[in-house]
Amino acid sequence: MAEGSVMFSDVSIDFSQEEWDCLDPVQRDLYRDVMLENYSNLVSMGLYTPKPQVISLLEQGKEPWMVGRELTRGLCSDLESMCETKLLSLKKEVYEIELCQREIMGLTKHGLEYSSFGDVLEYRSRLAKQLGYPNGHFSQEIFTPEYMPTFIQQTFLTLQQIMNNEDRPFECKKCGKAFSQNSQFIQHQRIHIGEKSYECKECGKFFSCGSHVTRHLKIHTGEKPFECKECGKAFSCSSYLSQHQRIHTGKKPYECKECGKAFSYCSNLIDHQRIHTGEKPYACKVCGKAFTKSSQLFQHVRIHTGEKPYECKECGKAFTQSSKLVQHQRIHTGEKPYECKECGKAFSSGSALTNHQRIHTGEKPYDCKECGKAFTQSSQLRQHQRIHAGEKPFECLECGKAFTQNSQLFQHQRIHTDEKPYECNECGKAFNKCSNLTRHLRIHTGEKPYNCKECGKAFSSGSDLIRHQGIHTNE
């Protein structure tokens, strides 16, 4: 086959808007990388071709789906005219998502000179498999063998076998997925064994795919060429911009068949479905705790490593999660966006509001199996259980005294440092505990919330009431 007879359309795949919407960010990035590389290869080898619309769209970061997609035609004008009325649409159901770009057909000068019709169609089929066209069929319009020149009929029949899953000798024993080439099979196995052979030279982080390294490098360069016209936010990948734009449009194309809940991102739907299945595929190698999301595991591992990458610029305190830093910063700003509709009290975090609302509802969902005592918060239950276990993991390095709670140790350490951060606005007296300041303030307010049920006498502190009750019991 002559070089001049090879066109960009022979080594490309077009998508309708519906098909494009079904691809996730990794698939879209892969498609973009492969298409741009193929066009670059054709140009660099002197094969003149006007810039296709899809390439212009990809370079601008726009969605490249094609309206009124044309049927794919043959590789040479003679074959095209001979077979114009004899098209056969072979519906090919492709396998689930392939995250990594595999060794597709090499677009070298030699390869283009000697590639057959079947070679190019095989390349197109393999690209479709990589993109993992989900839960359906990808239409591949090709010519029937009887109308093809004799020299390519055998190649076409071989291709037809591949496209009908009849020639996939390399099967994965882990998940049953089959591949037509050993190189694809080897690349796929990295998913199961967790092999990451592609290293970022900037930070040393490893990835399982070369395309992932390319995307990761933009973190170091700060490159964000794809900007949202609605709000001006910029992104490193066109697929991230496409996902972001759903915030403005409100589009949620991914719906859970179990409960009907819809999501903007396919990955969010996958995470959500694990609520129904109970699946927790991400386990911590240190303690064995399992999670439904890889991001949850990533955050959890920092407990073991002690890594706290999110630092407050106001006070220098560091956190394992960015969300915790955001909550902490509200201490400095005084922001309390979560308000209780019952009493109007406001909180800096949604979880604090949820815990507070249980005061009104009386809900105590966390029960101690040892004594039956119930608590409004899981953290309170964990602290309580240490009483039964005799566990006191928080030890003072100054005197060796141990405590069941970290907050108790923190308060105790003020005895050694003589720190008294809680000051009375009335008289200026300072205290090392907030509870001590609260009791002291009752001297100024005259408040006595602790009443004796025997005689009605009231006291400003619970300890005073207990001492008083000894009079009635003769203790």
From Swiss-Prot:
Q: Report the principal subcellular site.
A: nucleus
Name the Pfam families for this protein: KRAB, zf-C2H2, zf-H2C2_2
What is the primary gene name for this protein?
ZNF383
Q: Which GO terms describe its molecular function?
A: DNA-binding transcription factor activity, RNA polymerase II-specific; RNA polymerase II cis-regulatory region sequence-specific DNA binding; zinc ion binding
So where does this one cross the membrane? none
Q: Which organism is it from?
A: Macaca fascicularis
Record-linked SMART domains: KRAB, ZnF_C2H2
What name does UniProt use for this protein?
Zinc finger protein 383
**Keyword entries, A-Z:** Cytoplasm, DNA-binding, Metal-binding, Nucleus, Repeat, Transcription, Transcription regulation, Zinc, Zinc-finger
Q: Where in the cell is it found?
A: Nucleus; Cytoplasm
Entry's Gene Ontology cellular component terms:
chromatin; cytoplasm; PcG protein complex; transcription regulator complex
Q: Which PANTHER family match?
A: TRANSCRIPTIONAL REPRESSOR PROTEIN YY, ZINC FINGER PROTEIN 143
Q: Which residues form the KRAB domain?
A: 6-77
The record, for PROSITE patterns, names: KRAB, ZINC_FINGER_C2H2_1, ZINC_FINGER_C2H2_2
Q: Does the keyword Transmembrane helix apply?
A: no
